Amino acid sequence: MKLNHIPVLPKEVLKYLNVKSSGIYVDATLGGGGHSELILEKLKKGFLYAFDQDIFAIKQSKKLFANNHKIELIHSNFFFLKQELNKRGVFFVDGIIFDLGLSSFQIDDKERGFSYLSNEFLDMRMDREQKLTAHYIINNYSFEKLRNIFFNFGQEKNSSLIAAEIIKKRPLNTTFELVEIADKFNYNRKGHSSKKIFQALRIEVNKELELLQKTLHQCLSLLKEGSSIVVISFHSLEDRLVKNFFRANSIINLPTKLPIVSNFKTVLKIITKKVVKPSLEEIAFNHRSRSAKLRAAVKN
């Protein structure tokens, strides 16, 4: 299987990242290497550190960037971004990009269990070396834990019914077994309950929201003044987290009764007045970009 490295919102990423030819940049989610490729084209004396917890992405990108000496590929979850950079003597960077979507190769890989459209083993691990899988969650978590995961991470209204049916039908081994249960309670609503359940499981397996929140905080101390952080999300939970994080760090929140200091600066300045979405032309060219939402901010 080859990587599909068509980057989402390529022009917008370059616009808001504002790549300097001699800058130090971080691609926190290497994936198919599309955004890394865009950044590298702008670098002359600069350098790029690209992270991915999926070893397949790292191995394939080694081939893609085999002759490029301006990039280092790091097999690691972005949660360890600051630690890994500091180990390399890097304490400040000129920009960071996150593309939080599943890569095409992960969706298409029949052994990963990310897609509800094909019958696969319930895995859903980004990092194949970690122990926790969707299979373990489905077959071992309590009713309460399953219900809460489906409701909180999938925003599924019928989370209780689906969780109860899973407990009743255990053991479940494949994606289609789970799809059959989830869609049983769809009740003619638009869209698939399966999509919500699979999203919820993937978030739980990979601790996506928890690690994203912690990593965004790390980025504040890594960014130089005037440097950008760009985040592309693909569902409302991620987008809300990023939106709230940017807002919280872009407002002045001084204690009451203290004198106002005229030169007080916020940590971030939001540079996307509203969320940026792909054009109709991009969606027609790259269908998987359709739910992408980009937000960007600059370090003050």
UniProtKB/Swiss-Prot annotation:
Record's keyword annotation contains Zinc: no
Pfam families recorded: Methyltransf_5
Top-level EC class as recorded in UniProt: transferase
Enzyme Commission number: 2.1.1.199
Gene Ontology molecular function terms on file: rRNA (cytosine-N4-)-methyltransferase activity
Keyword annotations from UniProtKB, A to Z: Cytoplasm, Methyltransferase, rRNA processing, S-adenosyl-L-methionine, Transferase
GO cellular component, one term: cytoplasm
Domain of life: Bacteria
One annotated GO biological process: rRNA base methylation
Residues at which S-adenosyl-L-methionine binds: 33-35, 52, 99, 106
Localization terms from the record: Cytoplasm
InterPro entries tied to this protein: RsmH, SAM-dep_MeTrfase_MraW_recog, SAM-dependent_MTases_sf
Substrates-to-products reaction catalysed: cytidine(1402) in 16S rRNA + S-adenosyl-L-methionine = N(4)-methylcytidine(1402) in 16S rRNA + S-adenosyl-L-homocysteine + H(+)
UniProt keyword Cytoplasm present: yes
Family named by the database record: Belongs to the methyltransferase superfamily. RsmH family.
Role, per record: Specifically methylates the N4 position of cytidine in position 1402 (C1402) of 16S rRNA.
Protein name, as recorded: Ribosomal RNA small subunit methyltransferase H
Biological source species: Phytoplasma mali (strain AT)
Upper lineage: Bacteria, Bacillati, Mycoplasmatota, Mollicutes, Acholeplasmatales
